[in-house]
Amino acid sequence: MKKEIQFSLVYRDMWQSSGKYVPRKDQLARIAPVIIDMGCFDRVETNGGASEQVNLLYGENPNQAVRTFTKPFNEVGIKTHMLDRGLNALRMNPVPADVRQLMYKVKHAQGVDITRIFCGLNDPRNIIPSIKWAKEAGMTAQATMCITFSPVHTVEYYVNLAEELIANGAQEICLKDMAGIGRPTMLGEIVAAIKAQHLDIIIQYHGHTGPGFSVASMLEVAKAGADVLDVAMEPLSWGMVHPDVITIQAMLKQAGFLVKDINMKAYMEARNLSQEFIDDFLGYWIDPRNSKMTSLLVGCGLPGGMMGSLMADLKGMHAAINANLAKRGEKTLSEDELLVELFQEVQRVWPMLGTPCLVTPFSQYVKNAALMNLFSKSMGEKPFSRMDPAMWGMILGKSGRLPGTLAPEIIELAKEKNMEFYTGDPQALYPNELPKYIAEMEQLGWDRGQDDEELFEFAMHEKQYREYKSGLAKEQFNQDLIERMRKAGKPIPESLLPKQPEISEDDELAAVAMALHMAQKQALAPAATLPVIRSTAWKRFNPYKV
């Protein structure tokens, strides 16, 4: 009997590996039935990661978006799944236990079936509590192993990690190859070893295409017993994203696996809709570099999705580094030469920093350390003279246990700064906070929402939620979009033009509102720069009680 391989469309990750934002609620409602009509997907990634935070950033309610997107899939039996950062849940920094626990209740009520729980350090202590809470809420707990390639991250390392996660209740295992640098045969060996002991455990493989291994990896893990493969579709497949379902389906079908057929008419319709969403507004935040693969990532191991921000950082430092080199009488570097030096420095400092998996946020920490070392070198300073303050939590153990060991100079540097290392459970450092947010919502008269979903968003993304409630997020997003459209020479739609606000006849309020209105109008002129209006009166007619 042929082995069946299922496909999951990682619709959320397609967008967030390409750019910043995800489609709006109304766009998700349009694409969902077409994805269903394609007939080849048993699962769809609907939310999680940064998707809900960016909903708030463009001034819309993420809870409504999740419910809207999951509902059609729930009705036809396609399983929905979300990305969950373990200790960090849906943000970049640690989250209190009570907020994490509430997340699973809220997401299950919103129609999410499976949570993919990962920790960038692969520390089981950050994953195991989520397994318990997810199952209690009625979700399927998919424990995740972040894949990378290093002397620390061996087949034995991953098999032992899977055993621990399964022993603590994991119902599924995901191999999250976020940089796509897992070697195909190694991945096959990991899957085969897990299946040899746990035949009924579902294994899902997630591999980005950046350095070019992922198609071969998918064939290897399928042969070894994997059950589900994450795929993308045009116009956002390949590049730094994921292989296209058409290619993977054809490859596996020829190899003798049982795979569902693709309704190509629906595929083309979904393709056209996604392109329409890009043209509407999402494309203004998509970095074109993310549409190209590069083998330069094989050595440094950085995830391709961060190439856009990496190149922006590199460009920002390029002139300063060359100015320092010229001042010291040394040869200046081209941008390409500096890029190669950066990748080499990443390879050098990565093991010195404990070999964390290069995934959010730890990939940023390692990249920042390497870039600052290049700057320090251009100044004639020692390596690690300048450190990103945010990375000390990782170094000191406050984010979890590092897979490797810290270099002696890093330990000595921490001692010089009178910093203390922490070996306890990271969650213990972050006390419960829900009572604080409940009290404030009551004081402000804010509704906690269906199934406490508004309470959850407030506690998870406090700053962004306040700006969403005040209307500031929508205003800032529209200003940013108008500026990007203006730079691209695109006409500004009437819907983005600021409306004359309706306010009281208070003279100060009227003056501030009119000044803001006129400034926004003027921003549409080719050479205009939007002025910042500062007044205490603004707070009076734009309160948080919305």
Q: Locations of the language-model features?
A:
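Active-site beta->alpha loop and helix N-cap motifs at the rims of alpha/beta catalytic domains
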Residues: 33, 42-43, 47-166, 179-184
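Surface-exposed amphipathic alpha-helices with a cationic face
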Residues: 66-74, 128-138, 188-199, 249, ...
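C-terminal helical cap(s) of enzyme catalytic domains, especially alpha/beta-barrels
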Residues: 237-262
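Conserved, mostly hydrophobic/aromatic
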Residues: 14, 117, 173, 225, ...
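N-terminal amphipathic alpha-helix/helix-capping segment at the start of soluble metabolic enzymes
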Residues: 1-18, 66-71
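Terminal or standalone catalytic/regulatory effector modules within metabolic enzymes
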Residues: 36-54, 289-527, 538
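Catalytic cores of alpha/beta
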Residues: 156-165, 211-227
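Glycine-rich phosphate-binding active-site loops on the catalytic face of alpha/beta enzymes
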Residues: 117, 177, 224-243
